[in-house]
């Protein structure tokens, strides 16, 4: 079973009305592509190439899209890729599916000018912002640009949010008599040796979100993540928190029967484990409601610039957004699609229930939280 990647740090309408917001270095050999892609490489919209039809033709001429860090079981990316390949004559090559956002940025830098450089990126919001500041991305506005809330995109199209989710608590009811539903519940002695995060919060976005949510549940704030760090320190001292990165494999084996992760990943577990002896339940803790989006960006020096832009158009079409929705992720266009009647209601009704309305940290608050985690996390849980 494929592991859910621990996406590095970066982001929903009661069914979602939100719109306000907030490897190691890879190396490879290979020459830059020979074909003339200058027109596509400078296109800031499909209109710059004459329209979507012309963009499709240019992308199919390239024939390849280089992607990185897209596990098939993360937000339904496996089906997204299959649908894209079925619609267009473009083969999607995904390298290192379990890579983090930092690995993606490293690949952009280390493979500059090479055929194997990533064309497109799916990043934690902090990395999207820093990558834009480093001038690594190409500006591009998809046809659905105006439907993306201003707070969910960089004004020139250097990055734009794609899908998001809430921090949730997943629990194997086949192994746990009473599943926890709040962060406060996790401190109960009955959960000794059973609570895990999906990764290290200093590197992984889902784990980072878990600590942020725990902070909000313990009188912290976006400007003060320390209560969340202290919470996990207390959880570790009690023996409840275990230093094991939760994955589908560890869940199935019973090694991590309680996992703090994005709701779309935990909800995906529930589907995957049906008939396998795992009764996976998902709860979004009411005492620590925290939501986060990931972001799309195009490598400024993408070896397949037309395919990269066509990929973005597909992701932000109703088909692409509904495929993410099918994977329990909340697409950024869901509010407008709900209004237009293009959101698949059968998928919307399956989203985990949420109480309260989430808010989002500022860039400065995210930077401070990351710095505080880097300085204090290891000390708290060692």
Predicted regions and their residues:
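Mature extracytoplasmic/periplasmic domains
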Residues: 290, 294, 298-358
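Extracytoplasmic ligand-binding site segments that recognize negatively charged/polar headgroups
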Residues: 66-81, 94-109, 115-255
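Sec-dependent bacterial lipoprotein signal peptides
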Residues: 1-27
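Periplasmic-binding protein-like
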Residues: 164-168, 229-234, 240, 275-300
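Extracellular/periplasmic bilobal clamshell ligand-binding domains
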Residues: 340-382
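Short, polar/charged alpha-helical segment
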Residues: 51-64, 70-91
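Bacterial lipoprotein signal-peptidase II cleavage site
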Residues: 26-39
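A ligand-binding cleft/hinge motif common to bilobed small-molecule-binding domains
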Residues: 128-130, 252, 258-278
């Amino acid at each position: 079973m494929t592991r859910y990647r621990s996406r590095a740090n970066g982001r929903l309408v009661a069914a979602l009305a939100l719109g306000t917001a907030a490897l190691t270095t890879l190396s490879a050999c290979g020459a830059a592509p020979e074909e003339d892609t200058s027109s596509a490489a400078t296109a800031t919209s499909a209109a710059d190439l004459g329209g979507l039809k012309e963009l499709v033709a240019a992308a199919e001429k390239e024939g390849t899209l280089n992607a990185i860090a897209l596990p098939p079981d993360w937000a339904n990316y496996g089906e997204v890729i299959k649908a894209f390949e079925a619609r267009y004559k473009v083969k999607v090559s995904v390298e290192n599916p379990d890579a983090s956002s930092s690995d993606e940025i490293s690949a952009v830098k280390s493979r500059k000018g090479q055929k194997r450089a990533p064309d497109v990126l799916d990043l934690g919001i902090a990395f999207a912002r820093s990558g834009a500041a480093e001038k690594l991305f190409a500006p591009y506005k998809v046809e659905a640009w105006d439907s993306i809330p201003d707070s969910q995109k960089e004004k020139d199209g250097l990055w734009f949010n794609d899908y998001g989710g809430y921090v949730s608590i997943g629990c194997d009811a086949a192994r746990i008599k009473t599943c926890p539903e709040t962060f406060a519940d996790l401190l109960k002695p009955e959960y000794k040796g059973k609570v895990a995060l999906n990764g290290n919060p200093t590197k992984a976005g889902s784990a980072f979100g878990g600590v942020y949510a725990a902070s909000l549940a313990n009188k912290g704030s976006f400007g003060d993540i320390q209560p969340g760090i202290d919470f996990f320190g207390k959880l570790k001292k009690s023996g409840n928190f275990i230093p094991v990165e939760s994955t589908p494999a560890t869940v199935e084996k019973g090694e991590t029967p309680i996992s703090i992760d994005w709701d779309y990943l935990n909800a995906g577990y529930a589907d995957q484990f049906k008939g396998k002896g795992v009764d996976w339940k998902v709860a979004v803790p009411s005492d620590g409601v925290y939501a986060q989006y990931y972001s799309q960006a195009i490598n400024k020096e993408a070896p397949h610039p037309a395919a990269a832009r066509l990929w973005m158009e597909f992701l932000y079409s109703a088909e692409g957004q509904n495929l993410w929705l099918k994977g329990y992720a909340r697409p950024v266009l869901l509010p407008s699609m709900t209004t237009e009647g293009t959101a698949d209601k059968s998928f919307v009704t399956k989203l985990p229930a949420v109480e309260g309305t989430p808010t989002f940290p500022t860039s400065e608050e995210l930077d401070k939280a990351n710095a505080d985690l880097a300085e204090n996390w290891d000390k708290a849980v060692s």
